[in-house]
Amino acid sequence: MVTVALSLALIVQGPPPETSTTIVTAHQWVVRLGAEVGDSIWPGFRPDTIPVLYVVRGQGTLLLGWRGALPEGFLPIAGVDRSGWLSSADRGAASTGTELAGHPTAQVVVNDSQSVAALVGLTTHEAFHVVEAAAKKEGRRFGQGENSFLVTSYPVFDPQNEAGMALEGRVLAAAEEADGRARKRTLARQFLAVRESRHRALGPELAQFEQLAELNEGLAEYTLVRVVQLAARRRDFPDRPGAVRLRQAKLAGLRTLTANVRLSIRLRYYATGPALGLLLDGLEGPAWKARLMNENLTLQDALADAVGYRTQEVALRRQAESTFVIARLRSAADSGVAGLRALRRAQVDSVLAAPGVQLVVTVAGRYLGLCGIDPQNLLQVEPGVLLHTRWVQACAGDFQATFNTPVVQDRNAQMLRAVVGADSTVKVTTGAQGEVQIESPLVSLRAAQADVSRDGRVLTVKIKN
């Protein structure tokens, strides 16, 4: 591959030529490998088709791989196809999957010390996040992402959990260096025993956080490692030393998984995720990738299946399913759930069809919270929709409402609906500053800023920020 130096004749200010050359060379390798061996990185993955924004801090933003007219503000670069330059760089930019002019785009923040191998990997990592975002679907783990807010409550001061995590890193490092499938299999089973024991103590919410972080950032980092691995096999790859350094750094990271206390614990899964992927490669080749997506697995689940870790559990479950005819039980459950859905919808229709004023409360730009519920009288109607059959207290900043009547809560639309009594019993008071007060024997509502409108029997209150 011929290294292309950028001609910046059309640009008032540009990145240093050496940085430009490194970026363009790295991107050329991503395009080449994506076109030739994209499926070897991940099934259906074509990083060569995803445009990339390279943010060069203090210099500007380099756009490569763009198809069509350049986005506003970008100038073409002579000698580099499908490229553009913007002579400004967002100081707050991070490497991530993003969107530019309506197109899914990878974004990479560049520093002067990054090698070609590092940029090939990082570009692929961020391009994979674009794929994950496109694949996101309700009920599917792949593309879902983890609840990052849980880093605020993760037990970093728990020595038992920290020791267990450190042990996992050592086992994974040994598995990566192990010769032969039998040794890798033994170490994989040891890892699973340590991981599942630690997760039982950690609790289901944080265990799920770790597993989803490994699917999200861990798999993206696996594609980073994998693409550099594939690049280094090519004789003309210009940065084999960088590829070796990357592998050594990954192994060192596993051996010191909990040592760098200055960094967020979320970065641990950038180490365990690719290590699990490489271990699965060594155990069963590429087949695990499609299986992980098709069967909605975590990396941990995929590894357990690959080494038969839960063979006895599976055999006993199948025996019970055969003995007690799981197909009949599932059919009955399907029928029961369908009936429950119909019943809940009928309950909602009945509640809202009651005579009187139907009050609709909506909140824009913030979450409609609950300050009080009666759990004994709360029913799920469908995902995100609840029926409070007796009493509920809602709140959102300077808005508060107490209902002594059935209320339908739609958490997706941030909306409450309830019939709050006959017209003659409902008193609405509004103030010059947008204050609203609604009183009836069934509701007491106050808001500092809201719009009120009436359409027939429907009284709508839109709470403002």
Located regions from the model:
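N-terminal mature-domain "stem" immediately C-terminal to a signal peptide or N-terminal signal-anchor/transmembrane
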Residues: 14-80, 105, 220, 388-389, ...
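Post-HExxH zinc-binding segment in Zn-dependent metallohydrolases
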Residues: 70, 134-202, 206, 210-236, ...
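Soluble non-cytosolic domains of exported or imported proteins
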Residues: 20, 24, 113-122, 182-185, ...
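Active-site scaffold of zinc-dependent metalloenzymes
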Residues: 70-117, 123, 127
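Non-catalytic terminal regions of proteins
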Residues: 24-35, 260, 270-272, 281-465
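Active-site-proximal alpha-helical
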Residues: 204-234, 243-312
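Active-site recognition of the HExxH zinc-binding catalytic motif
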Residues: 121-134, 221
